[in-house]
Swiss-Prot record:
Known cofactor(s): Fe(2+)
UniProt protein name: Peptide deformylase
A matching Pfam family: Pep_deformylase
CDD domains: Pep_deformylase
Disulfide bonds: none
Entry EC number(s): 3.5.1.88
Gene Ontology process terms (BP): co-translational protein modification; translation
Residues bound to Fe cation: 99, 141, 145
Recorded catalytic activity of this chain's protein: N-terminal N-formyl-L-methionyl-[peptide] + H2O = N-terminal L-methionyl-[peptide] + formate
Length: 181
């Protein structure tokens, strides 16, 4: 089932997500729904708070990035439960980011080029991955969602132009009206 997205200015996007203690049938269904939702909206990652669930879970739909920048998508997304970024490279790389919860806007964000993340999969088994480049960026972006942080919070002030701020305000107003606020 395709879930409704939470958009910029939704309070759930600013909450710290609760850890997941148990893998339940409801959690498995949430992951299936998130996968359908991410595919429908053409995302590369999706965090549970973006579909209204403040739990420490995200999915990533990209398996690898080729040398020419082409993305290879997974048949079924990688599931990260209670993810923790345990290592980050000191080298920062700027990259252009967008977010399904902030439609139509993109911004330059500096992030470590290489990370190691530990998490549990949908079977409750712990795993660790070292990622670099775009895949590392996806994991950091989605992990930020679980801490109530949006990519716009990581943009430098000089990149938040007046036009960018005006567009952000338009998004806030549009989706506040749709939520009935």
């Amino acid at each position: 089932m395709i879930r409704d997205l939470e958009y910029y200015d939704s309070p759930i996007l600013r909450k710290v997500a609760a850890p997941i203690d148990e893998i339940t049938d409801e959690l498995r269904q949430l992951v299936l729904d998130m996968s359908e939702t991410m595919t429908f909206y053409k995302g590369v990652g999706l965090a549970a708070p973006q579909v209204g669930h403040s739990v420490a879970l995200f999915i990533m739909g990209v398996e690898k990035e080729l040398d020419d920048g082409e993305l290879i998508f997974c048949d079924f997304p990688k599931v990260f439960i209670n993810p923790v970024i345990t290592q980050k490279s000191e080298q920062l790389v700027y990259g252009n980011e967008g977010c399904l919860s902030i439609p139509g806007l993109r911004g330059e964000v500096a992030r470590p080029d290489k990370i190691t993340v530990t998490a549990k999969n949908l079977d409750g088994q712990p795993f660790s991955m070292t990622l670099e480049g775009f895949l590392a960026r996806i994991v950091m972006h989605e992990t930020d969602h679980l801490h109530g942080v949006l990519y716009i919070d990581r943009m430098s002030d000089k990149d938040k132009t007046k036009q960018f701020k005006n567009n952000l305000e338009k998004i806030r107003r549009k989706y506040s009206i749709l939520r009935g606020l």
